[in-house]
């Protein structure tokens, strides 16, 4: 048998194998697998014309729980020895209060079993998202993992559009929403899930290009941007560039209070115009003066119904992820009976108030709204707010504003929620453990 070492290819292969770090490769593989499980999902290209789709999905939930639970365990085991110090910083009184409140909320939920089951999945997904900034060994590995997952996702989405449009594009055969016919959804179950993911991939493409990835960076940017347009997702499309501009301003603003004003004043204003238009005639009249649909494509009926539910249990809430499954007998005002068939309240903040109560909502705001900006201020004060920090800030801001018309916060394996947690965790770790060099790791040693 010929010795491969005598051949140039054999020498190259031997060099590659000699330099291969098995642990780092396993960590990268786990990161990519996680991203694909979240974004492509375990059930890609669902057939929305199939009346049994919901039953089929429910019957396969065990696979989802096992998959995310296993990935979370593997991710922690692969990197725990190097990231233990970073993970210890998550054990704060605020985070422990949040966990404690969730336990309390689940115990007093209207459907404790449902809440517990769904929070178990959410906890696994959150663990994976928190590990994502730590799992790749270097920033270059981080870039390559996210780029690989984005390219695979985009390739699958476009192949679906070309080869199987009946399960990649909303059409008249869809049982639930045939009026969305023509809107692209790719591998996702709905355009409103596809569109925010594509907006986030636009930010990823910009980030990768800024780090010198002049081939796949622009490719991800262009193809995700084009797909975003064809999804017909109005909220994500409108926010994509507006949030990027807002993030750009925040990244050059010095003071923390000025940053807070720039980030949160428009956010409060939008919430007042949207949900506020339901309980305030003044905000309703102001909304009607704007060149937009004052019902926000029918969302006002859902908000009115959700506000009524919130008033029933403002402190305890109805139970994590347990309310919208049990409202088939609910009542709304005349002409808005369809609101009881909604899957969520179409506003992340209102949805949390309904399900986990005001204390839970306040804790979420402290952890996921206020703390990330404070962490960014720490990074900015050290003059270390590079492209990676800017990516996290942009995704975080996009999530805050997207949540004004869609419910995704604490939404189990929702890809927008997953990427939002990645951004929040990234800012948390960067504020405490700066990246060492252009391709260094998060220094947690």
List the predicted regions and their residue ranges.
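Long extracytoplasmic/lumenal interhelical loops at the membrane interface
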Residues: 288-304, 312, 316-356, 375, ...
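Membrane-embedded alpha-helical segments of multi-pass membrane proteins
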Residues: 57-77, 116-128, 193-202, 238-245, ...
